[in-house]
């Protein structure tokens, strides 16, 4: 299982339309290919959108990333996102901080 924390800087004035696109297109399309959205948050003062996703393997992610369904909305994502940061993280460490 692979877990990613993704931080997007969204172009000014586009955060609300990004959230709509995310909820209406990205989440359901991701789920169809086994890419689960674990959570999502907005940092409005910084125009940031932070989300966490998990997927079984790099191969499963590639299926999603090369799908026609994803390609159909990718032009819209590019117009919203100014900067992308992606971090692969380990699962199951919560008990270590209790």
What kind of region is each of these model predictions?
Residues 2-6, 30, 49-53:
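Short, structured motif recognition centered on aromatic/hydrophobic residues
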Residues 6-8, 87:
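Conserved hydrophobic/aromatic positions in well-ordered beta-strands
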Residues 9-19:
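Short, surface-exposed ligand-recognition loops at beta-strand->loop->(often short) alpha-helix junctions
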Residues 15, 60, 93-94:
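Generic "edge-of-domain/loop-turn" microfeature
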Residues 20-38, 54-90:
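An amphipathic, aromatic/His-enriched active-site/gating alpha helix that lines ligand/cofactor pockets
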Residues 40-42:
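Short, solvent-exposed loop/turn elements at beta->coil junctions and helix N-caps
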Residues 44-47:
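Short acidic/glycine-enriched loop/turn segments that link adjacent beta-strands
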Residues 90-98:
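Short, low-order "capping/linker" segments at domain edges
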């Amino acid at each position: 299982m692979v877990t990613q924390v993704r931080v997007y800087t969204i172009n000014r004035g586009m955060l609300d339309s990004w959230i709509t696109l995310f909820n209406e297109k990205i989440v359901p399309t991701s789920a169809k290919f086994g890419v689960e959205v674990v959570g999502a948050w907005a940092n409005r003062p910084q125009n940031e959108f932070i989300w966490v996703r998990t997927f079984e393997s790099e191969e499963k992610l590639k299926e999603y990333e090369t799908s026609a369904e994803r390609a159909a909305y990718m032009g819209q994502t590019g117009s919203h996102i100014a900067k992308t940061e992606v971090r692969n993280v380990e699962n199951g460490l919560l008990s270590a901080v209790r």
